[in-house]
Amino acid sequence: MPLVAHSNLPTFERLRKEGGTVLPNDYALHQDIRALHIGLLNMMPDAALAATERQFFRLVGESNQIAQFYMHPFTLAELPRGPGGQAHVERYYETFDTIQREGLDALIITGANVSQPDLALEPFWEPLAEVVEWAWKNVTSTLCSCLTTHAVMQSRYGERRRHRGAKLWGVFDHRVVDRTHPLVAGVNTRFDVPHSRFNDVSREQFDRHRLKVLVESERAGVHLAVSEDGFRLVFFQGHPEYDSISLLKEYKREVLRFVNGEREEFPPLPERYLSPQAAAILEEHRERVEQARQRRVPAPELPEPLLVGRLDNTWHDSALAVVNNWIGNVYQFTNHDRRIPFRPGVDPNAPLNWSR
């Protein structure tokens, strides 16, 4: 939470210039403290619906132990749902009409499964664009996760994602490339982020539209960037919300696809994710699966209990720090009325009053 500059101590101004969160005393005296309302547009398929809720709810809830958060999950009617997923949505989710009527302080938009080479052909394309446009006009800041980053870059900026040729899959080292921005204030200057994607939006594509890249990787490319105003759109290409076992679950799914004949080659191990012991266990399991396939006998199950305790999480603390900075800035600049994006005096074109 922010410091209050209640005196002329030069340290306050120094910290503010370094990107720290410092409130002017006159504003702090009149600040109306309230809970924040954060929307979660969950576009994930049924099998990942609840897990994605937990990941993002946990990321928000653990990032700040003082503020109170009301989470408002909703989805798009155009996304295909089975009976179980539809029942979950109908019972627990709000409608976009309700979201628009009551307002949000901030919005998180998840990724989604895709089947078309052009995102504009996906069933979520037009309704997602409607949500993003509404949020741009009515919400303090919107955080776009992976696939949504690609969709917004295409719909809003005309930049199509590009196929990498091979899947980027694993945990990769990243570096903060602009330490002055408030979103990365106090964050480790080097940290890990999981990635799981075939496609990429490059640094050059962000730069063409004066979008500011804050965190990137030599191997994985851009992870964190922001819109030209510095805050109203926040772009992730990685998956900082992932649990320690998320990549293991993805690996298990790909192994099952191999077993069922849905892919020809056995899946590779995620990069920089597994300890030597865990990698050895999975290599032995691969040999047993391939032998079972040759003999046409049932394949052995993935030995998850042996693996879970051998998985390191090298990204969660930094993810919490970035999200905490995001929430802290939303808290400072949002209006008391959550149907209005900014408090009086905040310039929507430069809400952070931050100079690039």
From Swiss-Prot:
Signal peptide: none annotated. The active site is at C146, H239, E241. The lineage of its organism: Bacteria, Pseudomonadati, Pseudomonadota, Gammaproteobacteria, Chromatiales. Transfers a succinyl group from succinyl-CoA to L-homoserine, forming succinyl-L-homoserine. Belongs to the MetA family. InterPro entries: Class_I_gatase-like, MetA_family. It is found in: Cytoplasm. Substrate binds at K167, S196, R253. CDD domains: GATase1_HTS. GO terms for molecular function: homoserine O-acetyltransferase activity; homoserine O-succinyltransferase activity. It catalyses: L-homoserine + succinyl-CoA = O-succinyl-L-homoserine + CoA. Its EC number is 2.3.1.46. Keywords: Acyltransferase, Amino-acid biosynthesis, Cytoplasm, Methionine biosynthesis, Transferase. SUPFAM superfamilies: Class I glutamine amidotransferase-like. Pathway: Amino-acid biosynthesis; L-methionine biosynthesis via de novo pathway; O-succinyl-L-homoserine from L-homoserine: step 1/1. The keyword Transferase applies. The record marks N113, L147 as: Important for acyl-CoA specificity. Transmembrane segments: none annotated. This is Homoserine O-succinyltransferase. One of its GO terms (biological process) is methionine biosynthetic process. It holds the Pfam family HTS. The record marks S196 as: Important for substrate specificity. GO terms for cellular component: cytoplasm.
